[in-house]
């Protein structure tokens, strides 16, 4: 049987758990037992977005494609080690193991796929776009387009039918790019 846990949020670089008075119970879909508690307190989304823009985005943009891809691979390996806990949580939502398989292992496989895309890029935080274009008669100067990571944050809204795959697919593409 699942243990009762409190689901925390990672905000401003730290884990935050709801207070007991703000915690809402989550119930097992089959037997109705409390399996976890989540917070329902108001969050300061403006400060969360500011932190994401100034700290999270800044640090992520410093990483090269190789570093970002390897980060995705490490995350996939970590999640794979803990996949049985995901199956247990999925069972509590009413899903069978075969229902959950495509979501859990497909989502982790998606991380591995995006991690492998790093091989298509150099070991720098930008990508070359096209060839060098000589612009002067003597070839003394020219142009080269580059693709750089966008500044800002991404807000993901995920469907309930694939909670693992949906989230991992969305974050993988943005962390790599």
Regions found by a protein language model. Give the residues of each.
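N-terminal Rossmann-like NAD(P)+-binding subdomain of aldehyde/semialdehyde dehydrogenases
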Residues: 2-139
